[in-house]
Every structure is written in structure tokens, then in C-alpha cells.
Amino acid sequence: MKKHLLLFITEILLPLTTYAYTGDVVIDGIRYNVVTKGQTAEVSFNNYSGNVTIPSTIEYDGVTCYVTSIGEQAFWKCEELTSITIPNTVTSIGQYAFTGCRSLTSVVIPSSVEKICFDAFWCCSGLTTVTISDGVISIDDNAFSGCNSLSSITIPKSVTFIGKFVFSGCI
């Protein structure tokens, strides 16, 4: 009886595990968390430097996946990161995503991004220019705090929520 029950449970769960497979992969120096079920990929932590261009799609295990988010701490303290190009498939920038990226000087947030999570660009002391495209809805607490070189920022009318201390410590 136990063998039949175990076999029955295995038959039920096996299709679920293959259908929702999640994995990590590094492609062209960028690390991704991939969910093939939803055909999505999230940029995750790696020791990035220089100019980084995130593609809109990646191929993983024969599946085309859209890069839809920049994960929590994806570029955490990547002090040698000088520029980032974010594709129009990204809808969110995670918590602490670019915290401490001191060599990053400018960033353009594409119109596909709806939310910039808290502390996303905290203490990016070299950041001078931020362009937020129309489409962004929410800028969470402390998103740009500590960016003491920030001299220009464009915030579109689409932004309906700006959290606390978003520009704290900016000159």
C-alpha cells in the first residue's frame, strides 16, 4: 500500500517539477535567476564592472526568457560599474539593486519599469544624472538617498508615489 501511495504521489508531482524548473545561469558575464515556466529571468548578483548592457531576452535550456527585473542586491557594491543599460522588458528594480555603485555616473530608467524599490541607488556617490521615463509609477523610500553628486533628475507625471527620504543626502 505504501509503495502504491508513493508511486501515486510521484506521478502527480513529477510534471510540476519539470514545468516550473528554476535555475541560475551566467551569460556574457551577467548572472540570471531563470523561471522557464513564466519564461522570465531576473538579473542577480555577480561582481560586475565597467559598462554592462542587460539584454531584453536570454536563451536558457532551449527557452527564450524575457529579462523582467533587476533583483535585490544585483549590483550591490559593484564599485567599478561605470554604466548600465536597462532594456524595455524590465518592470522593476529591486531593493539595494545598485547600492554603493560609486563609479556609476548616469542612469536611464526605461518606460517599462513600474517600480524602483527602496534603497535601489543608495549611496551611488558618483551618480550625477538620472532620467526616469514616463511609465514609472512608484519610487520607494531612500531610492536615491546618499547620491551626493546628483545634479539632474527627471521625474515624469506617471509617478504617483514617492516614498520618504528619496533624495536624502543629495546636494
Predicted regions and their residues:
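Positively charged n-region of N-terminal signal peptides that target proteins for export
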Residues: 1-4
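Bacterial N-terminal signal peptides
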Residues: 8-15
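Boundary at the C-terminal end of the N-terminal hydrophobic targeting segment
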Residues: 18-27
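Short, ordered beta-strand-loop transition motifs
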Residues: 26-40
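Structural signature of tandem-repeat unit edges
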Residues: 29, 47-69, 79-92, 102-115, ...
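Secondary-structure transition/turn motif
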Residues: 36-51
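Consensus positions within tandem repeat domains that build extended binding/scaffold surfaces
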Residues: 72-74, 94-99, 117-122, 140-145, ...
